[in-house]
Amino acid sequence: MLMKADQSTLLLIDVQERLMPAISEGDAVAERCITLATIAGLLGVPAIATEQIPEKLGPNLEGVKELCNKTLAKTHFDACPDGLIDELPEGRQHIVIGGCETHVCMLQTALSLLDAGYKVWVVADATGSRSELDRDVALDRLHQSGARIVTTEMVAFEWMVHSKHPHFRDIQALIK
C-alpha cells in the first residue's frame, strides 16, 4: 500500500532539546524529522508534534516547532490518552511517524493508532532510542503489529507520486 499525501498526517514524537543529545545518532534523527516536516509543509500534509513533559525535557527542537501545525504536550508515553486522536485531521487515515524514543513513546503511540484503525508508517531513519538494540527491536515489533517501516526518501517520493510534481526539485534537494 502506498502512502498518499492527501490522506496523510505527519506525527513527530518528542524531538526535544534535552532528549535528543541522549539518542543514538540523535543529530541525524533530528535532521530527518525536520526534513520530513519541511516536505510535509511543501506538500500540504498536516504535521503534529508531541512533547513529553516539556517542563522537564524541554520543548521540541526549533525546526520541529516552526514546521508543525500543532504541538501536544503529554504525560503518558502513548500520546493517545492525552488527546492525540482528537487533534488528528478528519479524513486522513495514513499516519507517518518519526521521533523518539522508538521503543517507548513512539512504539506505544503507533500501536494505539493501529488499534484505533489508522494505517501507520514508521520512518526508520527518523526514529531513535538511546540504545540501537531498543530501536531495532521496537521497529521489529511495530512491523509485526502491522505498521509499515519506511525511510524519509520513501515518504517523499510516495507523497509526490511523480517527477513532474511542482515541488520535485525542492524536495529532491532536501533528501539528496
Can you say where each PLM-predicted feature lies in the sequence?
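Active-site-adjacent betaalpha module
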Residues: 2-9, 42-43, 55-176
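N-terminal nucleotide-binding beta1-loop-alpha1 segment
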Residues: 9-15
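A short alpha/beta connector and helix-capping loop motif
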Residues: 5-8, 24-54
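A cross-domain feature marking catalytic cores of carbohydrate-active enzymes
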Residues: 15, 49-52, 124
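Short acidic, Gly/Ser-rich segments with clustered Asp/Glu that frequently serve as metal-coordination loops
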Residues: 17-21
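Short, solvent-exposed loop/turn segments at secondary-structure boundaries
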Residues: 22-26, 132-134
